[in-house]
Amino acid sequence: MVEQLLLPLWNSLATVDDETLPLMSTALLIARDEYPDLDANLYDTLVQSYVEYLRSEVEEISLWPLKMAAVNRYLFQKLGYSGNHDEYYDPRNSYLNQVFERRLGNPISLAVIQIEVARRLGIPLDGVSFPGHFLVRLPVDDGILVMDPFNGGRPLDAEELRERVRPHLGGEVPDDRALAQILNPAPHRTILVRILRNLHSVYANTNRWDRAARCADRILKLVPNQPEALRDRGLAYLQLGHRSGARNDLTRYLQLYPSTHNVDMVRGHLVDLSNERIQTH
């Protein structure tokens, strides 16, 4: 009997340890919100077929970087997975089932596939929540090898990494210690939240507030009382006319994050909501 891939339950995720939170399964759970008929077993079987194709070649290689090079050749050259440079903000780039089907994705979704295949082959690949552009990292004898899944798994040296991160640090070039901290492995929860934040951004920027609210709500399932997600869900509820939900979320946001830079904006919305409430009584 073929073992079935069981997706986790949203209400259970907050209490799951980061070490045991399944990355690909939870990414597929995110996709199931948009594609309710998604067959998770189909994609689990697909990944396993990649692993079986690569297994004998990878087992004959002794060095991690060369093992990973074989994985990258297969995924990005033979199978044709690639970054969607032309339609970067297409939400399908974040939904893992669509990335498998179209072999197009954004940096983080391609990284999830890369990590899943590598880990099943015993390769200790991790994600890196790099500013602006998600990356992956592999331990090597003299440090780490950092790769760009959006561009075929291309290795990146320290100089290029510093140049990439500099605009996100106000033009400052990080020293070795600061760069090492930026390149720390990302826990699965962090990766999944970033997928959802990407989707929220796409939907909010295109005024699809029901989906924006859903993405913020899912972040709160992963990280209860996460301040930015409370704010984002509250603002989405406001656009949807869910006044009580908006008031509750925005009030809680200010309780958790009283020094936020957008405190005046949030307080303004709460004043408007209070005035509306008074006028209706």
From Swiss-Prot:
SUPFAM superfamilies: TPR-like (SSF48452). Keywords: Repeat, TPR repeat. It holds the Pfam family Transglut_core2. TPR repeats lie at residues 193-226, 227-260. It comes from the Bacteria. InterPro entries: SirB1_N (IPR032698), TPR-like_helical_dom_sf (IPR011990), TPR_rpt (IPR019734). SMART domains: TPR (SM00028). PROSITE patterns: TPR (PS50005), TPR_REGION (PS50293). Belongs to the UPF0162 family. PANTHER family: F-BOX ONLY PROTEIN 21 (PTHR31350:SF21), SI:DKEY-261L7.2 (PTHR31350). This is UPF0162 protein XF_1494. It comes from Xylella fastidiosa (strain 9a5c). The lineage of its organism: Bacteria, Pseudomonadati, Pseudomonadota, Gammaproteobacteria, Lysobacterales.
